[in-house]
Amino acid sequence: MFSGEYEYKIDSKGRVSIPPKFRSQFADGIVLNKGVDGCIDAYPLPSWNEATNQFQSLPIVRNEKSRRMSRILFSSAFNLELDEQGRIMLPPALRQHAAIKDTLVITGVSNYLEIWSKESWNKEQALIKKETWQIFESAEPHK
């Protein structure tokens, strides 16, 4: 279970530390992907494999939408390992997607992490603060 908010600086080689309390959950690997909200999603490899296996087992008709969904899921996925210092290298394409230049925020979101640029996270936090009650009132149980 991932929770909390952690601010880090990206180094000159594009590396960032994963919060120490989460590193053991990424012992088998970490998969980074473009998040739909302009962030980077980070999944433990076993969780990613489970989700993609479920996706691939669906009776999907090979139509335009299903091909696009496959592209979204797989074309921007990067399978990485933490180095000895608990860091990962953020691929340039994902840094660009998330507009990450120097300071970033790693947030825990239940079963995965999100990696945001500091600026984008501040904007997201402002929206969350403004819409908190509407979000809770319209929330459906999480499966």
Question: Which stretches of residues belong to each language-model region?
Answer:
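Flexible "stalk/tail and boundary" regions
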Residues: M1-Y8, S12, F22-L80, E84-Q85, ...
